[in-house]
Amino acid sequence: MPAPTIYYIRHGETDWNAEGRLQGTLDVPLNELGRRQAVSAGIILAGLLARDGHEAAQIPFVASPLGRARLTMELVRRALKLPVDDYAIDPRLREIGYGQWEGSTLPEARAADPELFARRVAAKWTVAAPGGERYLDVETRMGAWYAEL
């Protein structure tokens, strides 16, 4: 079976994105720019779907459970003229968990534990922030989601 075509859309900007803060699993809402970005993503997706010969109403839509991802999805679907709430939620699509570093900027995380921060920068796939996830953990949960497509 050929690999499915997947259109990924990242959530729009939040104030924490603009400030350089690690959001991870914290539910930080979209800001005004983020809402505009989501609408633009919907318009771009409409063009991609038309180019690829797909009908938006015929493809599945899935989002992370975080509010910023859900609102992005709803704004994208509105731009596609689809029912805004007709999509699935899958927790495996959530952003990487940064544990105790969530809410911090990278300089703040570095200052809190310079040794661990350096190890994490050098080996993101195998080293996690305290209470957070490794990239390997994210790959595993995302891989499980992808295998079910």
Task: Map each language-model feature to its residues.
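Phosphate-handling substructures
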Residues: 78-143
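Active-site-proximal alpha-helix that buttresses catalytic centers in soluble enzyme cores
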Residues: 7-9, 13-82, 136-139
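Eukaryotic N-terminal low-complexity, Ser/Thr- and Lys/Arg-rich leader segments
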Residues: 1-2
